[in-house]
Regions:
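Residues that define the transmembrane beta-barrel architecture of outer-membrane proteins
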Residues: 44-50, 84-90, 122-128, 157-161, ...
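Outer-membrane beta-barrel "beta-signal"
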Residues: 162-168, 225, 262-280
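Residue-level signature of outer-membrane beta-barrel architecture
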Residues: 54-58, 96-100, 136, 167, ...
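Short glycine/proline- and aromatic-enriched beta-strand/turn motifs that initiate or cap beta-hairpins
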Residues: 20-78, 277
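Sequence/structural signature of outer-membrane beta-barrel proteins
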Residues: 33-37, 71-80, 99, 112-120, ...
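Repeated loop/turn-to-beta-strand initiation elements of outer-membrane beta-barrel proteins
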Residues: 59-65, 102-107, 141-146, 172-175, ...
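Outer membrane beta-barrel transmembrane domains
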Residues: 175, 192-257
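Transmembrane beta-barrel strands of outer-membrane/channel proteins
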Residues: 26-32, 66-72, 109-113, 146-150, ...
């Protein structure tokens, strides 16, 4: 009985904490952006991300969701390798579900501690931020979420309101996410094949060894195909296009010494995950 009860508690936790129909106890993603010509002159880069979601029950109706992750950016130019130094990040988001009296409402607090830089754990590489949002269940399978993201970025205090949904349209179509961070449409072809479209907005800053910071902005629109060769194993192929990209460096908050248009362009993302799909 212990295994089914553990899985049931795991499902309840994730249903409350995440706006998606699945959870990944482990996932790794690799993105390769192609060089492009024309006016946009897309800059090639690689991005590696690896992370997990680890649930912990601390007392009745109160849960933690630890979501540590690592990422790595390598950015090139048309003629020069590593136009910017390789930068890394290690982050520890800690999601806390706070029970409310009205069962239609949930509140989630998710502080995030991270080290971002050319060297990890070096001086002036630490950032503190977080996400907080409320969720309201209009009806079974229809949830609305709203809140805010904030972070002590090296370019200054970053604040962004959030609005999202966790919406099961029918047995095959699902919309989920929090904008402007990420929003996804998922379509179920069969139990082994899912697909759809995803939008991601990325804003991060990293401390360089010369004391400056690097700010990375990207907006990615992509289609994807999830293949499940086994129940909990998922491989993803995700081609897409990045727009309104910018690379900026600076030494003081809100003051940039360089601003480069990163260049719009195509990318391909490959992912592998141990995934638990949730019954919603």
């Amino acid at each position: 009985m212990k295994k089914p009860l553990l899985f049931f508690s795991f499902q309840i936790l994730v249903l409350l904490l995440v706006a998606q129909p699945y959870v990944d106890p482990f996932q790794v993603r690799y993105t390769y952006a192609f060089r492009s010509g024309g006016n946009s002159r897309g800059t090639p880069f690689t991005h590696l991300w690896a992370g997990s979601d680890l649930p912990i029950k601390i007392k009745n109706n109160t849960y933690l969701l630890l979501s540590p992750f690592y990422e790595n950016w390598q950015i090139d130019s048309a003629s020069v390798k590593n136009i910017q130094p390789t930068v890394h990040s290690i982050a520890l988001p800690i999601g806390l579900i706070v029970p409310l009296k009205n069962k239609k409402w949930t509140m989630v607090i998710n502080p995030i501690l991270r080290t971002n830089g050319e060297e990890l754990f070096a001086k002036n590489t630490f950032q503190l931020g977080g996400v907080g949002f409320f969720g309201y269940e209009r009806s079974p399978g229809q949830k609305i979420r709203f809140g805010a993201y904030m972070n002590s970025d090296f370019f200054g205090f970053f604040f962004m309101p959030l609005l999202g949904a966790d919406w099961k349209m029918d047995e095959r179509n699902y919309f989920f996410g929090l904008l402007p961070g990420r929003f996804t449409w998922e379509h179920k072809f069969n139990s082994h094949l899912f697909g759809g479209m995803t939008f991601r907005a990325i804003t991060n800053s990293y401390r360089l060894n010369d004391g400056q910071y690097l700010r990375i902005d990207d907006n990615q629109l992509s289609t994807y195909l999830d293949v499940y060769p086994a129940k909990n194993i998922c491989f993803t192929l995700e081609p897409g296009y990045g727009i309104l990209r910018k690379l900026r460096t600076g030494t003081e908050k809100k003051i940039y010494t360089t601003t480069d248009k990163w260049g719009d362009g195509f990318f391909i993302k490959l992912s592998a995950a141990y995934r638990v799909r949730l019954k919603k």
